[in-house]
Amino acid sequence: MKKAILSVSNKTGIVEFAKALTQLNYELYSTGGTKRILDEANVPVRSVSDLTHFPEIMDGRVKTLHPAVHGGILADRNKPQHLNELSEQHIDLIDMVVVNLYPFQQTVANPDVTMDEAIENIDIGGPTMLRAAAKNYKHVTTIVHPADYQEVLTRLRNDSLDESYRQSLMIKVFEHTAEYDEAIVRFFKGDKETLRYGENPQQSAYFVRTSNAKHTIAGAKQLHGKQLSYNNIKDADATLALVKKFDTPATVAVKHMNPCGVGIGDTIEQAFQHAYEADSQSIFGGIVALNRAVTPELAEQLHSIFLEVIIAPKFTDEALDILKQKKNVRLLEIDMTIDSNEEEFVSVSGGYLVQDKDNYVVPKEEMKVVTEVAPTDEQWEAMLLGWKVVPSVKSNAIILSNNKQTVGIGAGQMNRVGAAKIALERAIEINDHVALVSDGFFPMGDTVELAAQHGIKAIIQPSGSIKDQDSIDMANKHGIAMVVTGTRHFKH
């Protein structure tokens, strides 16, 4: 029977994953809070102390730091000497390590954190197990992100958990532990940048970097311009997160944390033009992110309008010369690598909330046409573009999009009809190829009726209302194609 060690601070999905492992004939070992939650869910699990024959000591500071754990993880199964030594010491092989670390970054993000609290959230045993298992990836599966649970289970079931995939998991581990260690160094060095002010001039603010990874705002290379403001940093982060969703050349413009224009194209110049045309008024004074290098031709277009921040993976020398003619525009060079499914958190009175990032993308084949009329190919393209954008828009959110750009955005309204009215009234075009995209279900048929009055012929929405059929009937009445995804994307 294969053995797995599970010790996680982020409990998302761990019970379901553990149950599936037991069904796949894995014997589970765990520690502390992870073991408690598995016990409560009646998942068969043993204490790591059953491996080490040594109790947890020092309030849990020493749990897994033991040869019985690390010998079982690090043994090279192709070396008879390693296996003989394990046998002599009565040490069992460990086949899987599932670990994520104490929430150090979240802890130190609290401005009132004490030194003792920070120190107690420095994980020792977790990184040690992760690094050991990652080093031995040829024989051991290492999982650090809950987002990888399902893929691992799928591969276990179809016998495709091969060395190449385990190597990809190994890379994620070393990226994760490197960022974790860097966050610790930055905190104890006092690595925080005082900003001119916060969201408003009467608010003081500073920027604490918990990572210097090149794919993050914190790790961006600023090539030109004034110091980033508090609002610049928030807007830039939102812009970057959205533009990374696109494989094709794409441009995203953001104002006040909401996209105002998103465009794609065969070239990055086309993509920018489409984003600009989506809302040429709101882009003024905004943040723009592009997922391709900025060329001289594109730089001339960008230079012609007032922008606070321009983000790209690269700027050519000639493009920099053009853009630097404006002394204040901030130019950020950022690696466009997709973020892992890290947690995000927000402070509230007396604490903070933590959740996984909303990175889930419903595959097209899992979406369902629920109307008599099916979408055309062009309507499908419009829907899929809008569905990538809508999670980045404040709820209630309605987007209108064609297959190359957003054409109208209604954001942050207290009711869905209100959001639809704004999107429809601001639309730069409405025709048979434009889709209406909703981040949440329609509580009744009125939004669909309003869309029909404006000539909309395709709608995509999550569904889930007890009155879903009213919206479907309304769509059928007006010959509208409707697709449901089963997944909502609220953003507060």
Curated annotation (Swiss-Prot):
One of its GO terms (molecular function) is IMP cyclohydrolase activity. The keyword Ribonucleoprotein does not apply. One of its GO terms (cellular component) is cytosol. Pathway: Purine metabolism; IMP biosynthesis via de novo pathway; 5-formamido-1-(5-phospho-D-ribosyl)imidazole-4-carboxamide from 5-amino-1-(5-phospho-D-ribosyl)imidazole-4-carboxamide (10-formyl THF route): step 1/1; Purine metabolism; IMP biosynthesis via de novo pathway; IMP from 5-formamido-1-(5-phospho-D-ribosyl)imidazole-4-carboxamide: step 1/1. Residues 1-144 form the MGS-like domain. Its EC number is 2.1.2.3, 3.5.4.10. It catalyses: (6R)-10-formyltetrahydrofolate + 5-amino-1-(5-phospho-beta-D-ribosyl)imidazole-4-carboxamide = 5-formamido-1-(5-phospho-D-ribosyl)imidazole-4-carboxamide + (6S)-5,6,7,8-tetrahydrofolate; IMP + H2O = 5-formamido-1-(5-phospho-D-ribosyl)imidazole-4-carboxamide. PROSITE patterns: MGS (PS51855). SUPFAM superfamilies: Cytidine deaminase-like, Methylglyoxal synthase-like. One of its GO terms (biological process) is 'de novo' IMP biosynthetic process. The keyword Ribonucleoprotein does not apply. Keywords: Hydrolase, Multifunctional enzyme, Purine biosynthesis, Transferase. PANTHER family: BIFUNCTIONAL PURINE BIOSYNTHESIS PROTEIN ATIC, BIFUNCTIONAL PURINE BIOSYNTHESIS PROTEIN PURH. The IMP cyclohydrolase activity resides in the N-terminal region. This is Bifunctional purine biosynthesis protein PurH.
